[in-house]
A protein has these predicted regions:
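Structured, non-catalytic alpha/beta "coupling" segments that mediate domain-domain communication
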Residues: 411, 415-417
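Charge-dense, low-complexity intrinsically disordered regions
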Residues: 430-470, 479-480
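Alpha-helix boundary/capping and short turn/kink residues
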Residues: 245, 396-399, 422, 483
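Hydrophobic alpha-helical membrane-spanning segments
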Residues: 157, 393-396, 419-420
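Short alpha-helix boundary/capping motifs
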Residues: 284, 386, 415, 434, ...
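ABC ATPase nucleotide-binding domains
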Residues: 367-390, 394-411, 424-442, 723-741
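ABC ATP-binding cassette signature C-motif
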Residues: 1-369, 456-741
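Extended amphipathic alpha-helical segments
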Residues: 298, 418-426
């Protein structure tokens, strides 16, 4: 017997206060497994998720094998984050209630909701915040302390009883909260049973509340509850021992070090951290807790490369936990994915492997199926021509043999057209490979389809400079922020950027990459001035800079002016000479079309759409030097690929600051996207053949230069480019991993 269950709850704020509705098919066995699970495997069939009348998933299957590591990929707006939140909030029917699911960013809120006696963020250090974020451990620690102090109290004989009852009451409160949640979401016979259980829980809770008010009890009950308190303490201590509670602080410190925190920053107050470091802190909270299912939504945001490599090694070595990750970082995703969940067309497709392997296999299958179909179409055309000739000859000469030949060939055409290869790669066998009732004797040849490629275009030829020369030249430049009694951020920097150059900056967070970009922009362009040294700029150079604050600035502006649209904002930035058709053309080239730019308020656009608006402001008209500081943060993998292809055509100079290895290699070092991202073949207007790759390699982009900013504020050119920096980052990550052990 199969039935459908339905659950509904308010969705997160970023969905505008709508509701998320989840439906799924469940058997009686599955329903029983929800209450008494034998494993932590998640298998949800016929799953549909709708947000505010917009369907994200439609009758698909979600299958998460216990302890396997998954990466979910899909374009921005397809609902990846919403799906993770639906799983974490318990909205998906069929997931056992006892399964502990942890979503990055939820840890602290859960602790506060559970009433854990935690310090306020104003007075809590980073280490305290991470240690105390584990609500289960914190509850056990508090209970153990309460019971120990009560049992050791030699004056008040009732103290252990009161502590025992108080803990029992608090646990009942948690059970009651969960009981309400279950009763609200179940219907039919199971809903009726859940409501009966809820009534019993409410009665027990009322009795417990009354027992807290009792001042005296008889000696027999006192003795029994004293023993119960001692037994409860032993149980709590055993639970703490099983979860290595004594090692919580050491583990938290090791994880924080791995994520790039220095010792002095670990002892800082959480309230003093910037937004990026707070995000790292929340990631540490998620990594230090036990969970059956760990959900990480874009965990590499704000991480530098050593921390990214440390994190991918940490996840690969994580045993016994199912991990589901969304990420825009292709290299990171490829490193951690044991299995891929592809979200497209409102379904989840499962593939055993990572994104690059999936794209390669899908592209190879598309080529194979295309060639097979073309060959069969040619054969079919020839047979149809022969049949037509036989029928004509039979009519002209009254030849029955020709009619029989035509009928025979027509039967052959109907029976033998279609897939010639079986499920296991051998010869097609009807009974094995095409069971059930079908209208033909061969399976139809299905060529895998691809999402339309994200194609970004913008003016790629900056105005002529009129006379030659370097765009920017830095000579012995040093910089220190005023009032800071420390070493300069940058020391003796020598760097020259010529027209059309490709320069990449790599280094740890805080090493001075953004500061160097600000110095290149100069004081007149909203940048910085050097403490010492000289910076010479071409007299006619125009520079544009995308910074990590570009999206925040647009968001703040849109919040103060909630009715302004992307089109109006772009035209205001350009000035009086702006023409609407030109502004629309620039925005359209970056993927923002029609009513999205003219009618939808800028404040309602997604992070990825705001990135495109920020780029439009920089690229109209195109500058001779374009500085991109972490431009990929809000973009999905397909959009990053589209941006890569557009930037490879850009004739101006590029200065790229990024931790994304794929982006650095393809934009700065000129490596072929066809080699690093097999899925780029699908962007070749359906021409799935080797010629596209060979043409790209023959065209060959001149490799740029990658520079590393050292901890001493110096800029050093990496002769081996990003490969050399990745080796340096890997060694740093290995040191951090050894510190963890």
């Amino acid at each position: 017997m199969v039935r459908k269950t339905k659950e509904s709850a308010p969705v997160a704020e970023h969905h505008g206060g709508g509701h998320i509705t989840v439906t799924a098919q469940q058997s009686r066995y599955a329903l029983d497994a929800v209450d008494a699970p034998a494993s932590k495997e998640i298998l949800i069939k016929d799953l549909s998720i709708t947000v505010a009348n917009r369907e994200l998933l439609s009758r698909t299957t979600l299958h998460l094998v216990e302890a396997r590591h998954y990466v979910m990929v899909g374009r921005n707006g397809t609902g990846k984050s919403t799906i993770l939140k639906a799983i974490a909030d318990g909205l998906v029917p069929g997931i056992p209630w006892s399964t502990r699911i942890l979503l990055l960013g939820q840890t602290r809120e859960d602790s506060i909701e559970d009433g854990i006696d935690a310090l306020g963020l104003e007075s809590e250090t980073v280490l305290q915040h991470v240690v105390r974020s584990d609500r289960v451990r914190e509850r056990y620690v508090r209970e153990a302390k309460m019971l120990s102090e009560a049992i050791e109290d030699s004056i008040d004989s009732m103290a252990p009883v009161r502590a025992y009852r108080r803990i029992g009451h608090e646990r009942l409160a948690l059970q009651l909260k969960e009981g309400h949640r279950i009763a609200e979401r179940r219907s039919g016979a199971r809903g009726k049973l859940a409501r009966k259980e809820l009534i019993k829980l409410e009665e027990r809770f009322e009795e417990s509340e009354k027992s807290l008010q009792e001042a005296e009890i008889d000696s027999t009950q006192l003795s029994e509850e004293m023993q119960a308190a001692a037994d409860l303490l032993a149980g709590v201590q055993a639970s703490l021992e099983l979860m290595d509670a004594n090692e919580a602080e050491a583990k938290a410190r090791a994880v924080l070090l791995g994520l790039g925190f220095k010792e002095d920053r670990i002892d800082k107050l959480v309230s003093e951290l910037s937004g990026g470091w707070k995000t790292r802190c929340e990631l540490a909270c998620a990594l230090t807790q036990y969970a059956d299912v760990l959900l990480l939504d874009e965990p590499t945001n704000f991480l530098d490369l050593p921390s990214i490599i440390w994190l991918q090694d940490y996840i690969r070595n994580l045993k016994g936990t199912t991990v589901l990750i969304t990420t825009h970082d292709r290299d990171f995703g490829d490193a951690v994915a044991e299995e891929l969940l592809v979200l497209r067309n409102q379904t989840l497709e499962t593939f055993r492997g990572n994104l690059s392997l999936y794209e390669r296999e899908r592209w190879k299958k598309a080529r194979y199926m295309t060639k097979m179909k073309e060959a069969q179409d040619k054969q079919k055309k020839h047979i149809e021509k022969t049949i037509a000739g036989n029928i004509k000859a039979a009519k002209d000469k009254g030849d029955d043999k020709k009619l029989k030949q035509a009928a025979s060939r027509k039967k052959k055409l109907d029976d033998r057209m279609g897939l010639q290869v079986g499920l296991k790669g051998g010869r097609f066998k009807l009974n094995r490979d095409l069971g059930g009732y079908h209208l033909s004797r061969r399976a139809e040849i299905e060529i895998p389809d691809f999402d339309p490629p994200v194609q970004l275009s913008f003016p790629h030829q900056p105005p002529d400079l009129k006379f030659p020369g370097a765009l920017v030249s830095l000579e012995k430049v040093s910089f220190a922020y005023p009032g800071r009694k420390k070493l300069p951020v940058l020391t003796d920097v020598n760097l020259t950027i010529h027209p059309g150059a490709r320069i990449g900056l790599a280094g740890l967070n805080g090493s001075g990459k953004t500061t160097l970009a600000s110095l290149i922009m100069g004081g007149d362009e909203g940048g910085l001035l050097p403490t010492s040294g000289t910076i010479a700029r071409h007299a006619r150079v125009k520079m544009g800079r995308f910074s990590q604050q570009s999206v925040e600035e647009i968001t703040a502006m849109a919040s103060s002016n909630p009715h302004i649209t992307a089109l109006r904002h772009l035209m205001d930035c350009v000035g009086d000479e702006a023409q609407e058709k030109d502004a629309r053309a620039v925005l359209s080239g970056l993927g923002l079309h029609g009513q999205t730019v003219s009618d939808v308020p800028l404040v309602l656009l997604s992070g990825g759409q705001k990135v495109r608006v920020a780029l439009a402001k920089l690229l109209w008209p195109p500058p001779q030097l374009l500085i991109l500081d972490e431009v990929t943060t809000h973009l999905d993998a397909d959009t990053i690929l589209g941006l890569v292809m557009a930037l490879r055509e850009y004739e101006g100079a590029l200065l790229v600051v990024t931790h994304d290895r794929f982006f650095m290699r393809t934009v700065v070092e000129g490596q072929s996207p066809y080699k690093l991202a097999p899925g780029v073949h699908a962007a070749s207007e359906g021409e799935a053949d080797e010629s596209s790759e060979s043409e790209d390699e023959e065209a060959g982009l001149a490799p740029g230069s990658v520079f590393r900013l050292t901890s001493k504020g110096q800029v050093r050119k990496l002769d081996l480019g990003m490969d050399e920096y990745e080796d340096i980052a890997a060694r740093t990550a290995a040191k951090l991993a050894r510190a963890r052990r």
